[in-house]
Amino acid sequence: MNITYYGHATVGFEIDGVNVLIDPFLTSNPHTDVDPSTLRPDYLLLTHAHFDHIEDVELIAKASGATIVATHELATYYEKKGFSVHGMNIGGGHAFPFGRVTMTQAFHSSSFDMGDTPVYMGMPAGFIIETNELTVYHAGDTSLFSDMKMYGERFEIDVAFLPIGDNFTMGPTDALDAAQWLQAKRVVPIHFDTFPPIKQDAQAFCDQLHRRGLLIEPNTTIEI
């Protein structure tokens, strides 16, 4: 599996020839200069509706024809705008061509602004993706929560993408607990350093995980 990290919470996967992109935030992302219109994912997975997770959804979906996978409310919003969608809800799973996706809970919020009015778009979520090669967990934006222990018991997680920025999500201390509960073989910190309130020392976080910690520099593709 090839994994590309674009900074913040935007992660791309190439799985058996299928391209998946999670939470496309590129245009305003200070960690990347990638032109979102050049990306051609087959699927766009959205954890929630905040701007820093969906900024480039429409641009990329128009250019690529990607199917948008999101909570029912958010998927319905994009479906009414003419996009191909697959709606899900917390606890549900579906077998896609690249693997089985389970939508997990996340403790956060999920809205975007329509004019001056914030509109809520269902629950925030995370994704556990089981492929022929690896099992990956993208936690989305979340606090630490006890069901992560159950995820670690039920799934053999190879790579976990965990937010460490604090303030809006869990910080490094709670993310270390999450890493232990999940029993993930590798842990990649995300959602840090994009804005001043979420400035963190990601290398120090990884050092505390020893060989399990994996710091991926933005705009880098690695093979796992």
Swiss-Prot record:
Q: What is this protein called?
A: UPF0173 metal-dependent hydrolase EAT1b_0495
InterPro entries from the UniProt entry:
Metallo-B-lactamas, RibonucZ/Hydroxyglut_hydro, UPF0173, UPF0173_UPF0282_UlaG_hydrolase
Task: State any single GO MF term.
Answer: hydrolase activity
Pfam families associated with the record? Lactamase_B_2 (PF12706)
Where does the record locate the signal sequence feature?
A: none
Q: What is the lineage of its organism?
A: Bacteria, Bacillati, Bacillota, Bacilli, Bacillales
Q: Which PANTHER family match?
A: UPF0173 METAL-DEPENDENT HYDROLASE MJ1163, UPF0173 METAL-DEPENDENT HYDROLASE MJ1163-RELATED
The superkingdom listed in its UniProt entry is Bacteria
Instruction: Tell me which UniProt keywords the record has, alphabetically.
Output: Hydrolase
Q: Which family does it belong to?
A: Belongs to the UPF0173 family.
Q: Which species is this UniProt entry from? A: Exiguobacterium sp. (strain ATCC BAA-1283 / AT1b)
